[in-house]
Amino acid sequence: MIVTYNKEQVGDVLMLTLKNSGDAKLAVERKGKVARVFREDKQETVAWNIFDASSFFAIEGKGQVFLTDEQVDRLNQELEREGFAERLVNDREPKFVVGEILEMVAHPDSDHLNICQVAVGPDKTVQIVAGAPNARVGLKTIVALPGAMMPDGSLIFPGALRGEKSYGMMCSPRELHLPNAPQKRGIIELDDAEVAGTPFDPARHWHE
C-alpha cells in the first residue's frame, strides 16, 4: 500500500494505492469520507481515497507518507463504519533494499534486456527484467521492490517486460535522485561486503 498526501495540490485527501490498474476502466464507490476505486471488469479494489483526512489524525509532510499501525486502525474503523468489508494492511517492510544478482540470462525477445534472479533478503529471491549495461552476476545494487514510490513519483508494481515477469527494479543513482549522480546509464554498484536485504541508506550506500 502506497500512501500519498498533498494538501496544496489535491486538497485534504489521503490517497492509498494498492495495485496497478493498468488500462482497466475504473469506477468509484463513495460512502461518507471514504471512496473505493475499483476495476469494473474484476470488481477489484485498486485504491482508496480518504477525504477530510486531517479530521482522522494529523498528517505531516507531502508526497509519500508513512502511516503508523494506529493510524491504519483508525482508517479501518472508518471503512467498517461506512459498510466496506475490506480492511487496510500496513506494510512496513522496506521497499528499497540491497540486492545481489544471482543469475542472469538474455531475454528471449530482446537484444538488450536480461532476466535476473536477484536476492533481496536472506531467503527471498525475485525475478527482475533489466536493461542496465553494467548488470552482471555477483553485482550488488539497490532494488526498488513492489510497493515502492520512486523519487519522481512513479510507483513500482509487479509487471512484465516483453512477456517476462518482473518484480521490482534495479536502480541507477539518477533514478534515486542521488547527489551528483552520473548521467550515463547503469545501476548503482555497491561494495561486495553489502548484505542482500539491507535497507537502502543514501549516506551509507552512495559516495559522491
Segments from the language model and where they lie:
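Phosphate-backbone binding interfaces of nucleic-acid-interacting proteins
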Residues: M1-E208
